[in-house]
């Protein structure tokens, strides 16, 4: 859950987001070390009067500054490729939910059930109850079972949208005529908020997403009441 003046990432709720957080810290450490080294070299060049104007060739130095960046790029690329593979891999999903973007709301269809589908609109500020979040609450939440792999099929009816829930490490483009997929797995119950992350028109800012992750028993009761 995000909070005012937050400086870091949202708390990870899925295995993918945990991996992304660790990768962020790993990459940030490498960038910090490189930046410190470059600033140190620049400071030496500005403060020292020692120069090598007669140096015409330095094969050892050239070898080092060719190999070292390649090694650093490999250290960044390998964990990145691993996470990309994890995000694309979907094995035996327990549930499939089709998400369609519209100007300016989302519609959801639980494809494993015959008549379980609904539209999800933002609740206007004037209709909010005490404790509800402005521009983030919806009239119909997406209820999903926790601790189970869920496949989200994402597309659009009109223009480009993007279905994003930061605490779950999700951001998938909704493209007209194309069906993208993502995996949702939550480690704990709760409400998780997101928004459309692709500028899609004048009301782009009013397309919130709310996932309600519940135990499997509660999800079965909810789905039975919705059919």
UniProtKB/Swiss-Prot annotation:
Pfam families linked: COX2, COX2_TM
Membrane topology: Multi-pass membrane protein
Entry's cofactor comment: Binds a dinuclear copper A center per subunit.
Catalytic activity annotation: 4 Fe(II)-[cytochrome c] + O2 + 8 H(+)(in) = 4 Fe(III)-[cytochrome c] + 2 H2O + 4 H(+)(out)
EC nos: 7.1.1.9
GO BP: ATP synthesis coupled electron transport
Record topology, Mitochondrial matrix segments: 46-59
Example of a GO MF term: copper ion binding
Quaternary state and interactors: Component of the cytochrome c oxidase (complex IV, CIV), a multisubunit enzyme composed of 14 subunits. The complex is composed of a catalytic core of 3 subunits MT-CO1, MT-CO2 and MT-CO3, encoded in the mitochondrial DNA, and 11 supernumerary subunits COX4I, COX5A, COX5B, COX6A, COX6B, COX6C, COX7A, COX7B, COX7C, COX8 and NDUFA4, which are encoded in the nuclear genome.
Protein's recorded name: Cytochrome c oxidase subunit 2
Organism, scientific name: Oenomys hypoxanthus (Rufous-nosed rat)
Gene (UniProt): MT-CO2
